[in-house]
C-alpha cells in the first residue's frame, strides 16, 4: 500500500513539474547572453573561436548586460584579435 502511494505521488509530481515547465516562456533578452563582455572575447575563445579578421562581432561597453552593445569587426591589434567598433 505504501509503495503504490509513493509511486503515485512521484508520478503526480513529475507530471506537475512538466506542466509548470511547459508554461514558462523564454525572455526576449536571451540573445544578450550571447554577447561578449569585452572586445577581446568578442573575437576569441571560448565562445568565438572561429572568428578571424573581418568577422562581425559585438560586446557590452560596460560590466553589465544592460550596458550599451557595441558592434564592430574583428581586427588584429597589438598582436591579438579584438573587436573594433565600426
Curated annotation (Swiss-Prot):
Disulphide bond pairs: 43-57, 45-74, 49-83
UniProt keyword annotation of Signal present: yes
Region (Lipid-binding): 44-54
Residues of the signal peptide: 1-21
Secreted among keywords: yes
Motif segment (Gamma-core): 72-83
Compartments, record wording: Secreted
Biotech exploitation of the protein: NFAP2 provides a feasible base for the development of a fundamental new, safely applicable mono- or polytherapeutic topical agent for the treatment of superficial candidiasis. Moreover, thanks to the slow emergence of NFAP2-resistant Candida strains, NFAP2 can reliably be used long-term in the clinic. The combination of NFAP2 and rationally designed antifungal peptide derivatives (PDs) as biofungicide can also be used for the fungal infection control in plants and crops as well as in postharvest fruit protection.
Origin superkingdom: Eukaryota
Keywords of this entry: Antimicrobial, Disulfide bond, Secreted, Signal
Domains: entry comment: The lipid-binding region (residues 44 to 54) shows potency to insert into the lipid bilayer, where the disulfide bond-stabilized short motif CPNNC could play a key role. In addition, several areas, including the beginning of the N-terminal (residues 1-8), play roles in facilitating initial membrane contacts. The gamma-core motif is essential for the formation of the biologically active three-dimensional structure, and that its modulation is not an efficient tool to improve the antifungal efficacy or to change the antifungal spectrum of NFAP2.
Biological role stated in the UniProt entry: Cysteine-rich antifungal protein highly effective against yeasts such as clinically relevant Candida species, including the multidrug-resistant pathogen Candida auris. Does not cause metabolic inactivity and apoptosis induction, but the fungal cell-killing activity is connected to its pore-forming ability in the cell membrane. NFAP2 has a low potential to trigger resistance in C.albicans in vitro, and the developed tolerance to NFAP2 is not associated with severe phenotypic changes compared with development of resistance to generic fluconazole.
Protein name (database record): Antifungal protein 2
Amino acid at each position: 500500500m505504501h509503495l503504490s502511494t509513493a509511486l503515485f505521488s512521484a508520478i503526480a509530481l513529475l507530471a506537475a513539474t512538466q506542466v509548470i515547465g511547459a508554461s514558462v516562456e523564454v525572455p526576449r533578452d536571451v540573445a544578450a547572453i550571447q554577447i561578449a563582455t569585452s572586445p577581446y572575447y568578442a573575437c576569441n575563445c571560448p565562445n568565438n573561436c572561429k572568428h578571424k579578421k573581418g568577422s562581425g562581432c559585438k560586446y557590452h561597453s560596460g560590466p553589465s548586460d544592460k550596458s550599451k552593445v557595441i558592434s564592430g569587426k574583428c581586427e588584429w591589434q597589438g598582436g591579438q584579435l579584438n573587436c573594433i567598433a565600426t
